[in-house]
């Protein structure tokens, strides 16, 4: 029998920070991907990773709200490098880091933590396209990946195990990315990847 259930963010952090726990977490994640293939969205909230499909209007109530957040530049850098490593290893071109897209991604990650939701849509119904247009950025194509995870590495691993998120990361339609990582302390980390041409 396999079961998955929500884990409080402070417990996730404690497990990730321990030497034994972090090793177990990596192995546990290896079991999650096959379970998600069998059970679909039922297993989208677990010890290691929470996400929703890149083109869905699904909304998840996080069960908390916090203003005690800070930009996690180190995680943004790690994730940016991991994204480009995946692209280049498959013969693709590296994405350029775009500061305007990064600011939009940071704002969305912060908004989700402050207002306790997890979605590509703000509570007012605004999408990544709306947010980018509102910032005066021109684009032909736009995409977004979201993850709530204890680390950039686990978030990126989760993206690469999800066909829709992986497609965004590897798409030749995009040449720019902005990554916004917000650290909510005991509440964990929120990641937004905003892709554009």
Description of each model-found segment:
Residues 142, 175-177, 189-191:
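Envelope-exposed proteins and targeting segments
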Residues 166-170, 180-184:
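Short, exposed beta-strand-loop hairpins at the edges of beta-sheets
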Residues 1-107, 182-197:
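N-terminal targeting leaders of exported, membrane, and organelle-targeted proteins
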């Amino acid at each position: 029998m396999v079961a998955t259930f929500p884990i409080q963010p402070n417990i996730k952090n404690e497990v990730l920070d321990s030497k034994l726990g972090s090793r177990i977490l990596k192995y546990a994640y290896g079991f999650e991907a096959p379970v998600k293939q069998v059970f679909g969205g039922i297993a989208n909230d677990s010890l290691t990773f929470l996400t929703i499909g890149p083109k869905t209007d699904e909304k998840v109530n996080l069960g908390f709200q916090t203003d005690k957040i800070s930009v996690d530049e180190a995680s943004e850098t790690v994730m940016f490098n991991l994204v480009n490593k995946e692209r280049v290893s498959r013969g693709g071109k590296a994405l350029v880091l775009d500061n305007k897209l990064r600011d939009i991604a940071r704002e969305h990650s912060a908004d989700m933590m402050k207002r306790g939701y997890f979605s590509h849509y703000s509570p007012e119904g605004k999408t990544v396209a709306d947010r980018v247009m509102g910032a005066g950025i021109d684009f032909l194509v736009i995409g977004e990946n979201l993850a709530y995870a204890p680390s950039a590495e686990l978030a990126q691993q989760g993206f690469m195990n999800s066909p829709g998120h992986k497609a965004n990361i590897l798409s030749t339609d995009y040449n720019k990315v902005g990554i916004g990582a917000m650290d909510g302390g005991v509440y964990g980390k929120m990641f937004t990847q905003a892709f554009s041409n």
